[in-house]
């Protein structure tokens, strides 16, 4: 079981939109140095909707090869086609990924039974730990707690990333899942609350900008050091909120670029962060103690 701060890592790109693999590898080294507990590649924050199939493969393979066992690599392998999700998951296992993150199928709006059959088919086709990803604000389909509990009985399905931000719902899930099934926060603003209720970690956007602090917050929460966990969360709270003033990953790429780690290039239809938000995010970074 993976625990702690798992970064939903950005995908660096050159000004012409090509993948910047040199900076991608440098980011992995940065997160290892900063004590990040795991890396999630080619997820929402990694711009999975706008990388093609070959690039998706390349990013997963590069992450696994460069990490070289120094940090767990969780590959984003979700798709709204079950066959495509299986193919990506097979590739990830063969590439050496430690686990996969599989988002609920988007746009085609399956029923709860359709969701169950989708994830069951992937788990039966590929022997790799799978974390479900529930983000109804993007997918317009919601993995209910009851469906998550059904899926938790399937070998290989080891956890869920809950990006609803609904703490009552997360608490309900934590009380009902088996001990070997992990519940991760997918909402930075409520991550600490979920951790204190028994959550196992966070798959974090904020960790791109403040990786060591996110790791330390998780560590403090697990140790029962509420004062320290709250202190860190207070420092980070504006980042938790302001990194979503426009669609993720627009703001976080701007912030990571200010740190000198990447440039802030995005692929259409995403566009550069509106100038009206530059100062807002700069102040949030300064509040967190990040040099801008």
Curated annotation (Swiss-Prot):
**According to its UniProt record, in which pathway does this protein act?**
Amino-acid biosynthesis; L-lysine biosynthesis via DAP pathway; (S)-tetrahydrodipicolinate from L-aspartate: step 3/4
Chief subcellular location: cytoplasm
| Pfam families reported for this sequence | DHDPS
Query: Can the keyword Amino-acid biosynthesis be found in this entry's annotation?
Result: yes
Q: Which PROSITE patterns match?
A: DHDPS_1, DHDPS_2
Give UniProt keywords alphabetically: Amino-acid biosynthesis, Cytoplasm, Diaminopimelate biosynthesis, Lyase, Lysine biosynthesis, Schiff base
Q: Which CDD domains match?
A: DHDPS
**What residues bind pyruvate, as annotated?**
45, 203
Q: Which reaction does it catalyse?
A: L-aspartate 4-semialdehyde + pyruvate = (2S,4S)-4-hydroxy-2,3,4,5-tetrahydrodipicolinate + H2O + H(+)
Catalytic residues per the record? Answer: 133, 161
Q: Which GO terms describe its molecular function?
A: 4-hydroxy-tetrahydrodipicolinate synthase activity
Looking up InterPro entries in the UniProt record yields: Aldolase_TIM, DapA, DapA-like, Schiff_base-form_aldolases_AS, Schiff_base-form_aldolases_CS
Name the GO terms of the biological process aspect: diaminopimelate biosynthetic process; lysine biosynthetic process via diaminopimelate
- The EC number(s) given in the record are 4.3.3.7
Q: Where does the UniProt annotation locate this protein?
A: Cytoplasm
Cellular-component GO terms for this entry: cytosol
Gene3D superfamilies associated with the record: Aldolase class I
**Superkingdom to which the source organism belongs:** Bacteria
Which residue positions hold the site described Part of a proton relay during catalysis? 44, 107
Q: What does this protein do?
A: Catalyzes the condensation of (S)-aspartate-beta-semialdehyde [(S)-ASA] and pyruvate to 4-hydroxy-tetrahydrodipicolinate (HTPA).
Instruction: Tell me which PANTHER family the record gives.
Output: 4-HYDROXY-2-OXOGLUTARATE ALDOLASE, MITOCHONDRIAL, DIHYDRODIPICOLINATE SYNTHASE
According to the record's subunit comment, the protein's assembly and interactions are: Homotetramer; dimer of dimers.
Q: Which family does it belong to?
A: Belongs to the DapA family.
Q: What name does UniProt use for this protein?
A: 4-hydroxy-tetrahydrodipicolinate synthase
Q: Which gene encodes it?
A: dapA
């Amino acid at each position: 079981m993976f625990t702690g701060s798992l970064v939903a890592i950005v995908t660096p790109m050159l000004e012409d939109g090509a993948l910047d693999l040199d900076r991608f590898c440098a980011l992995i080294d940065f997160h290892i140095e900063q004590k990040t507990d795991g890396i999630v590649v080619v997820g929402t924050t990694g711009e999975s909707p706008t990388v093609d199939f070959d690039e998706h493969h390349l990013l997963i393979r590069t992450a696994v090869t460069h990490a070289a066992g120094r940090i767990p690599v969780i590959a984003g392998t979700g798709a709204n086609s079950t066959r495509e999700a299986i193919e990506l998951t097979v590739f990830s296992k063969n590439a050496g990924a430690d686990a996969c993150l599989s988002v609920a199928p988007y746009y085609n709006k399956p029923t709860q039974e359709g969701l169950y059959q989708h994830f069951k088919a992937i788990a039966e086709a590929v022997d790799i730990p799978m974390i479900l990803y529930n983000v109804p604000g993007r997918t317009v389909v919601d993995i209910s707690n009851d469906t998550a509990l059904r899926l938790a009985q399937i070998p290989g399905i080891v956890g869920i990333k809950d990006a609803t931000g609904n703490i009552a719902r997360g608490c309900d899930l934590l009380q009902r899942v088996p001990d070997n099934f992990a519940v991760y926060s997918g909402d930075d603003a409520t991550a600490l609350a979920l951790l204190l209720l028994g959550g196992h970690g966070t798959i974090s956007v904020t960790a791109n900008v403040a990786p060591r602090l996110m790791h330390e917050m998780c560590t403090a929460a697990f140790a029962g050091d509420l004062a320290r966990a709250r202190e860190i969360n207070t420092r980070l709270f504006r980042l938790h909120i302001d990194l979503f003033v426009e669609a993720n990953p627009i703001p976080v790429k701007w912030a990571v670029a200010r740190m000198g780690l990447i440039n802030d290039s995005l692929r259409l239809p995403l566009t550069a962060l509106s100038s009206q938000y530059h100062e807002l995010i700069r102040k949030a970074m300064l509040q967190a103690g990040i040099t801008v």
